[in-house]
């Protein structure tokens, strides 16, 4: 479990920073671990407290891990001594490798990481469990603690399952043809042109994936999620607070945010199950069954090629759907406060029930039978009435027409 606290800079912090002793040039130590015996079906498990981890394809087919230890102190000798206290522990068991960066936790419980990706001036504090100890990391343009970290470049052969747990810092992956599980307590995770299954979980940070051939599971406690050009498996994405953007997706989709907008553009899979506690849901050029829920926000879908089920619900907002709903057998749209507008190119076979507590109801479809019109309500069968449509607006108009 980790806690991340964003700390704004102050005049006092600037003064303290200016008064602190100047650090010598960082001492850097490089090493490479190679194991040609690890083949497809094997695994690598890498754990690091703080730093930047890159995961790339092994061009020569050999598992290799490059480590780059960086330490800074008041003088070169102290920096070299500090760097020497960080060890890389490696365990091999058959076709599996475990590597862990062993920090001098008996000497230091607080570390500073000059995060080059930090936006602006200030720092973040992350408290996390590592190697059986409680550790605090200050990251940003300034901070306090032992100035010590290690960066890794992991060269992954095809089919070797890689797990990275990098508590603080960026994780990047590019061109890897293997299952991946990337985890961070506080840091962004990025991947492009990967194959096989992909998992990414961060406590705080953005997750961005593009050109992925395989199933995807992405989660962040606080941050945006972006996935583009995915095929070959289902998609699960979740953020506690942040936007979700999905473009050109081939798999079935489950997406959720506690607070933020959800955008899905271009989907050819079995359908989408999307939810936001507070925000809009926007779909364009989407195929399959749909379950869309917004606690507070609009639901808008255009150029839909709907499957058998379309369910939409918003506590406060409009529901607007257009496209081909001809294959739908169960349609429901519910808005506590807002209008419902549905336009379809093909008319489905269904019994329609449309009501509004305080608004107009306009259903105009060809071939309607058994029509019943009452104050703020409408019922009818269309195309044989095999399926059902339940349209209900607490406050707003209801419209259902053929384009």
Predicted features along the sequence, with ranges:
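Intrinsically disordered, low-complexity terminal regions
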Residues: 1-403
């Amino acid at each position: 479990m980790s806690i991340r606290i964003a700390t704004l800079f102050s005049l006092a912090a600037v003064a303290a920073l200016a008064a602190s002793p100047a650090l010598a040039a960082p001492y850097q130590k490089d090493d490479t671990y190679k194991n040609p015996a690890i083949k497809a079906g094997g695994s690598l498990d890498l754990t690091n407290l703080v730093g930047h981890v890159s995961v790339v394809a092994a061009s020569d087919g050999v598992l290799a891990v490059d480590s780059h230890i960086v330490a800074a102190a008041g003088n070169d000798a102290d920096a070299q001594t500090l760097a020497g206290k960080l060890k890389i522990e490696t365990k091999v068991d058959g076709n599996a490798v475990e590597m862990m960066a062993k920090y001098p936790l008996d000497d230091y419980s607080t570390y500073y990481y000059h995060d080059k990706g930090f936006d602006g001036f200030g720092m973040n504090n992350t408290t996390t469990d590592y190697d059986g100890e409680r550790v605090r990391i200050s990251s940003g343009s300034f901070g306090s603690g032992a100035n010590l970290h290690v960066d890794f470049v992991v060269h992954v052969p095809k089919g070797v399952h890689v797990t990275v747990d990098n508590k603080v810092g960026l994780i990047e992956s590019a061109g890897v043809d293997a299952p991946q599980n990337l985890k961070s307590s506080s840091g962004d995770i990025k991947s492009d042109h990967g194959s096989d299954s992909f998992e990414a979980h961060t406590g705080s940070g953005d997750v961005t994936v593009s050109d992925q051939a395989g199933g995807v599971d992405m989660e962040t406690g606080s941050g945006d999620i972006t996935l583009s050009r995915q095929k070959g498996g289902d998609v699960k994405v979740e953020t506690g607070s942040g936007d979700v953007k999905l473009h050109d997706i081939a798999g079935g989709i489950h997406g959720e945010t506690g607070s933020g907008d959800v955008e899905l553009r271009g989907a050819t899979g079995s359908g989408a199950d999307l939810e936001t506690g507070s925000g809009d849901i926007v779909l364009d050029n989407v195929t399959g069954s749909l379950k869309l829920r917004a606690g507070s926000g609009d639901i808008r879908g255009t150029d839909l090629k709907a499957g058998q089920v379309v369910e939409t619900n918003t506590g406060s907002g409009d529901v607007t759907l257009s496209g081909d709903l001809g294959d739908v057998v169960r349609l429901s749209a519910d808005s506590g406060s807002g209008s419902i507008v549905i336009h379809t190119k093909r008319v489905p076979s269904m019994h329609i029930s449309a009501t509004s507590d305080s608004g107009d109801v306009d259903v105009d479809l060809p071939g309607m039978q058994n029509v019943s019109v009452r104050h703020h309500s409408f019922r009818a069968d269309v195309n044989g009435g095999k399926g059902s449509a339940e349209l209900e607006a607490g406050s707003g108009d209801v419209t259902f027409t053929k384009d």
